[in-house]
């Protein structure tokens, strides 16, 4: 299991860094060859649509098939598609081919990610699950900061094909790592034999499970609500920072590092904590931290500050918000791994991912309309989101006292 744990950490690094670098370079490349923001926006739309429409379908199948064979096949498809696009003359200067490669790589990345997440506990055991979830989170946050910096340096000297070569190498390394991971073959066979139902009936099993397990239902429901409200925060932070307080893109980049820095710090600390507390306690503290971080965002709207003070306030706020998000997400991911049955875990994770992909963009859409209508909605939305976090913290207490879950 320790060998699997090490291989999964390595796989996480190589699979993410290749995708991050290519996505970063592709955004600049599309804007360069078309001069159209809409062409770039289409890539984001494709990405979101694939996650919304494809997650539940993939979740249905990965609970029924051999996970290792499926991951290997997805990695092979990624590698072959990269080779094909690379060999087609002038393909990366044509939007059609760019959209095709984006679709293929998004589908394969999503499929591999869901498959790994659905079988994580069986791969590393309870002994290493805390470290696996936490350190994967650290890698994601490190690359969130590092990949754009590295990508910018590489893009200044090399063209988009260089990034395709880098991605080909990282995907090939990821494939070699997967081949060395020992999957639980007995479990894969058991799931394949037991789950022989239609698509809709199989998800009825998931909803039945949620109905009888209030703790898992609470995680799914509160996550959806928070994702919707965080659409306002996601748009509101850069929107208010630039348009209301007249800050520049460099300063925006500085404050946005606060979130991944919080993720890195907490991800390194969490596995070493001896008393991690209950899930409800963690979620309560996380909601309070989120509320405090969001309320701090309201301070510059109330009184006048120098630009440096606004920069510091926003950075502190984002760091606190990032701490609250990670304090919530890491224990939740570990809890889900331990308490959702393997036979439906893929479908549950797919359902959760689909709801997140729907709720946050919807929140972003509503926020954009309101913020364009009147800037007063910045402080209103921040205040409402903070109040909602306090309400959720209280509801967790009520459930713990009266229903005895978690």
Predicted segments with their positions:
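Helix-loop junctions on the cytosolic side of multi-pass membrane transporters
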Residues: 164-194, 396-406
